[in-house]
């Protein structure tokens, strides 16, 4: 998203391809997580320290939410692009309402509808869809400078974009490690 803003400010014709490029690479990378979620959820839970009971309880949960990996990634991407395109209030609303959706629908799906852990997984899996939908408000507005210009995925451009995001990535990974530990 930062590279998009820099290129847009330089009036570069390449600026419009960054959003599409990010979405495509997120999908490509998410295929790994979908594969792990579908075929190795028990191994993943065990790797993260789950005992046999946790593996049994969390297997379906992990399988469901890992299949929604593209949506989690797209939500982060949409949020970053909207924020960097000058609309931090929409980005914050997307984060807030997707989190609230998760909390409320965890309860609704688990207890009144009796879906147990699968219901919790569905609530978690669908929450980024809410965030993306809210970000679409910005994309449809006249204020948006983001265009969905199809471009071929480029590994070189991916590395170029990732240079700026390394510090955020380290922060996210650190947060995850601290949570697990």
Please report, for each region that a protein language model flagged, where it lies by residue.
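Interhelical loop/hinge segments that connect adjacent transmembrane helices in multipass membrane
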Residues: 124, 135-176
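Membrane-interface helix-loop junctions in multi-pass transport and translocation proteins
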Residues: 89, 99-132
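Small-residue-rich hydrophobic transmembrane alpha-helices
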Residues: 1-34, 72-91, 180
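Helix-loop interface residues and adjacent transmembrane-helix termini in multi-pass membrane transporters
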Residues: 8-9, 84-85, 111-114, 118, ...
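Short membrane-interface helical motifs at transmembrane helix boundaries
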Residues: 32-63
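Helix-terminus/linker motif at the lipid-water interface of multi-pass membrane proteins
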Residues: 45-52, 108-115, 176-181
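Residue-level signature of transmembrane alpha-helical cores of multipass secondary-active transporters
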Residues: 26, 65, 91, 95, ...
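Cytoplasmic helix-loop-helix junction between adjacent transmembrane helices
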Residues: 50-58, 62, 69-96
């Amino acid at each position: 998203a930062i590279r998009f803003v820099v290129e847009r400010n330089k009036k570069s014709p390449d600026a419009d391809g960054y959003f599409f490029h990010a979405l495509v690479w997120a999908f490509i990378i998410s295929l790994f997580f979908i594969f792990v979620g579908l075929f190795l959820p028990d191994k993943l839970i065990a790797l993260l320290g789950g005992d046999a009971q946790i593996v049994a309880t969390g297997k379906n949960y992990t399988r469901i939410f890992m299949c929604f990996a593209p949506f989690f990634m797209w939500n982060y991407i949409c949020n970053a692009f909207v924020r960097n395109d000058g609309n931090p209030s929409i980005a914050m609303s997307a984060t807030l309402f997707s989190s609230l959706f998760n909390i409320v629908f965890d309860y609704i799906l688990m207890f009144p509808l009796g879906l147990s852990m699968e219901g919790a997984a569905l609530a978690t899996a669908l929450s980024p869809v809410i965030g993306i939908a809210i970000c679409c408000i910005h994309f449809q507005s006249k204020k948006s400078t983001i265009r969905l210009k199809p471009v071929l995925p480029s590994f070189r451009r991916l590395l170029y974009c990732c240079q700026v995001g390394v510090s955020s990535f380290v922060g996210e990974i650190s947060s995850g490690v601290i949570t697990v530990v």
